[in-house]
Amino acid sequence: MKFQKKNRPRRAKFLKKYPFEFRKSLPIPKGFKIRPSSSVHCPSGILSKGELLNRYAPNNLSYMLNTPMSPFNLKDIRKDSASRSTNGVVTIPEVFSIYDNPDESIITLRKIISALLVETNRHVYFDYSRCHEIDIATQAIMDILLKEYDTFMTKAHKLQRRSVEREFAEGITGRNINNDNLRKMIFSIGSPAVLGITQRDFPDIIRNSMCSRSMLTENDRKNLSAMKELDTTDMVDYVVKCLAKMNKRLTPKKRNDLCTVFGEILINAEEHSSLKHRFSVGYFQDINENGKHYGMLKLVILNYGATIYETFKKNDSCPQEVVSKMKALSESYTHRNLFT
């Protein structure tokens, strides 16, 4: 009698492995230990996590970790046992959304930072087995965090190989992505795509991949106007493409209005941020369910650093009436402690 092997459904996952192996002379960590950088004792010539971050962390990551009011302040995360992962495993909540489930979502992002930058895990896992919904803004925040971490790791490994091999995990993995809609978002515009691991096409998805623009260097500033025009056109063309999927179109006037709106948002996100860096991403899904056919378009434009209100309140030439209105608008977003 022959027994047939059961065909089990494959669970989607992704893996980012860094180009080094742990040396046999190094102890394999069991679980994790909290290591405040001020009390870490490292062998001669080896830098601690804190020292490596101080030297090589990109601007956005450094801002997130060091700003006192940031929900991702590294000193606060070190002290908070609720922000630790489970032996390197971070379970993504059922609803991963800073809008609909802010407390649990912020804690999850803090756990990711702890797993990567505080604990001594050999590997870090993001477990999506419980998750059935992610909003695109929260996905973007997570992806930017991981991209900044990846940039940091690449630079630090080139310059301080021994220290990085001793202090950091050799890879990160997303696993148990069982929900079909989550799988489509994650593999089209999410972490695997942003980190350059893999990017997949789906017949019902139109993506506008993560765009990152900065004006930190002189060359960046010279190209600012041209890049803004290019990105504005790209975003409007993307919206037009999504509308065409639904057999809809924009009139020339409405297209021009949309160009004006996108252009203003992009330039505000760039010029009025203290970090002079903006990100944008778009995601469209063609949906047929319960006898209804419709499209869902989601766009995110964000930056890190000071808010527009914080920027203008320090400008003596800005009218006080405008500053007061901006303060009220800012407080409507910050009263839930989602943003600084």
List PLM regions with ranges.
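Glycine-rich/acidic phosphate-handling loop/turn and adjacent ATP-lid/helix
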Residues: 291-340
